[in-house]
């Protein structure tokens, strides 16, 4: 039985890494060893930032809700507003509240009034 050479397999593996590093600066886009390191690091960043994205969006929603609540009533804080929502039995998540605050201020004002009445 003849010996199997690994040239095509190695070439495919190298090509996959080099293709993933397309657009990187300098040798990182052409040199297999540095491209491998760059792609590995990029994947680490991507994995980490998929988790961070969720935190960042939640923080953004909270900031938007807080700003809209304070525009409506300066004495009311985000914390007291959320407490009022819970007491009023209004189950709307922060994403929807932030969207309402930005795109439909009248509907958001009605929710704020209900939450304030429940306090």
UniProtKB/Swiss-Prot annotation:
PROSITE patterns: RIBOSOMAL_L20 (PS00937). GO terms for biological process: ribosomal large subunit assembly; translation. Keywords: Ribonucleoprotein, Ribosomal protein, RNA-binding, rRNA-binding. Disulfide bonds: none annotated. One of its GO terms (cellular component) is ribosome. One of its GO terms (molecular function) is structural constituent of ribosome. Belongs to the bacterial ribosomal protein bL20 family. Binds directly to 23S ribosomal RNA and is necessary for the in vitro assembly process of the 50S ribosomal subunit. It is not involved in the protein synthesizing functions of that subunit. This is Large ribosomal subunit protein bL20. It comes from Jannaschia sp. (strain CCS1). The gene is rplT.
């Amino acid at each position: 039985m003849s010996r199997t050479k690994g040239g095509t397999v190695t070439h495919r593996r190298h090509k996959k890494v080099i293709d993933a590093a397309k657009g990187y600066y300098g040798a990182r886009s052409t040199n297999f060893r540095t491209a491998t390191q760059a792609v590995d690091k990029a994947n680490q960043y991507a994995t980490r930032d998929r988790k961070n994205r969720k935190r960042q969006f939640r923080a953004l929603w909270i900031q938007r809700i807080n700003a809209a609540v304070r525009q409506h009533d300066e004495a009311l804080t985000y914390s007291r507003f959320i407490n009022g929502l819970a007491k009023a039995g209004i189950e709307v998540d922060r994403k929807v509240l932030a969207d309402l605050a930005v795109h439909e201020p009248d509907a958001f004002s009605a929710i704020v009034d209900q939450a304030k009445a429940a306090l």
